[in-house]
UniProtKB/Swiss-Prot annotation:
Its main location: cytoplasm. Residues 154-200 are annotated as: Domain III. Has three domains with a flexible linker between the domains II and III and assumes an 'L' shape. Domain III is highly mobile and contacts RuvB. It comes from Chlorobium luteolum (strain DSM 273 / BCRC 81028 / 2530). SUPFAM superfamilies: DNA helicase RuvA subunit, C-terminal domain (SSF46929), Nucleic acid-binding proteins (SSF50249), RuvA domain 2-like (SSF47781). GO terms for molecular function: ATP binding; four-way junction DNA binding; four-way junction helicase activity. This is Holliday junction branch migration complex subunit RuvA. SMART domains: HhH1 (SM00278). The gene is ruvA. It comes from the Bacteria. Residues 1-64 are annotated as: Domain I. Keywords: Cytoplasm, DNA damage, DNA recombination, DNA repair, DNA-binding. Belongs to the RuvA family. The lineage of its organism: Bacteria, Pseudomonadati, Chlorobiota, Chlorobiia, Chlorobiales.
Length: 200
């Protein structure tokens, strides 16, 4: 129903944020990663959104990137995983590490997440591996490398957002850097992206 909300940050806590959009304050449940990526109160931000509809309540979930929202929705497809546990997974591990654990068939990497036991970790991998493979870039689908680069792209973009750049400008700059140097670290990508935007 909603793709994203753009508005003024009212408050940010480790597990929730309030965004004011056109005079209306919306409360979102968020991961700790999204919490860290949001600017201070008073600044503008974008939260990619998932609306959970239940008989007794409507709840908005907010994400710092489309990748995080996409993984959240995939986790909801796993039997026995609801919004609370899906958000716990995203709070416990970066998106790229979850992708890597699934692609590498390594359930032990998910055990450290609160609420995820051996059976749940095994189900996540069993039920999502094929879906994650389809999401990986061509030529990288069979290895964790594609997921790692996805995480680098996400982290570098979020770093540029915290510096005040628009999401469009940040994404374009990061994409250009990764195309020229796919093996760069997050720090290298951010530095190169800043240089590229400065020279425009």
């Amino acid at each position: 129903m909603y793709a994203y909300f753009r508005g003024r940050v009212v408050s940010v806590l480790p597990e929730e944020a309030v965004l004011e959009v056109s005079g209306i304050a919306y409360r979102f449940l968020i991961s700790t990663g999204t919490s860290r990526s949001l600017p201070q109160a008073g600044n503008e931000a974008i939260l990619y959104t998932h609306l959970s509809v239940r008989e007794d309540a409507l709840q908005l979930y907010g994400f710092s990137s489309e990748e995080e929202k996409q993984l959240f929705r995939l986790l909801l497809l796993v039997s026995g995983v609801g919004p609370k546990l899906a958000l716990a997974v995203l709070s416990g591990l970066p998106v790229a590490e979850v992708h890597e654990a699934i692609l590498a068939n390594a359930p032990e990497r998910l055990f450290g997440v609160t609420g995820v036991g051996r059976k749940t970790a095994a189900r996540i991998i069993l039920e999502l591996r094929d879906r994650i493979l389809k999401l990986s870039p061509p030529g990288a689908a069979a290895t964790p490398a594609g997921a790692v680069q996805c995480g680098i792209r996400e982290d570098a973009t979020n770093a540029l957002l915290t510096l005040g750049f628009s999401r469009t400008a940040a994404q374009q700059a990061v994409a250009g850097v990764l195309e020229a140097n796919p093996g760069g670290s997050v720090e290298d990508v951010v530095k190169s992206a800043l240089l590229a935007m400065h020279n425009r």
